[in-house]
Amino acid sequence: MENNNPYNLSPNLLKRFEQFKKIDDKTKMFERVIALGKRLPVFDVSLKTEENQVKGCVSLTYIAAKLEDAKVYYTGESNSHLVQGLLALLIEGFSGLSPSEILLIDIKFIEDMGLSQTLTASRANGFVNTYNMMQNYAREMLLELSSDEALKS
């Protein structure tokens, strides 16, 4: 049986994955990514801290996470329209998942999606750093949930 979701993508991310795979024009792909970024809600200024800044990203990019009902919710912002769109892709794809579900998502999806071939090396590196930061938040929240469960026992 063929696995149509080898990267363990969330339903939202799988939907975007399928949409982007069909785009073979670099300009159209960038337009679609930028359009995604315009849909992100305004990022709370109080969250623009060094701790929430994505390191190794050419653009000034922030990502924050909160745990609510055992699910992780992300918010973010970048001063680059393209990076804002990439951020929106990840936020849309990761938010509302459990920390465990987030940790199962394989970053290699970006290659098969067709996006990695269109990004400059520095943008691709920034995307990886953003993904890693979101994974780290999920890891921290998984530990938090585990310790909460241990305290209840």
Residue ranges and their predicted role:
Residues E2, P6-K15, Q19-L60, L67-V72, ...:
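N-terminal intrinsically disordered, cationic/polar leader segments
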Residues E51-V58, Y74-S78, S100-I105:
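Solvent-exposed interaction patches of small proteins and small membrane subunits
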Residues K71-T75, Q84:
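Short small-residue beta-strand/loop micro-motif enriched in glycine and branched aliphatics
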Residues S80-L82:
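Short, surface-exposed beta-strand-loop junctions and turns on beta-sheet-rich folds
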Residues L86-S98:
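Alpha-helical support elements that line or immediately flank enzyme active sites
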Residues G96-M113:
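Glycine-rich phosphate/pyrophosphate-binding loops
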Residues L151-S153:
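Charge-rich (especially acidic), low-complexity segments
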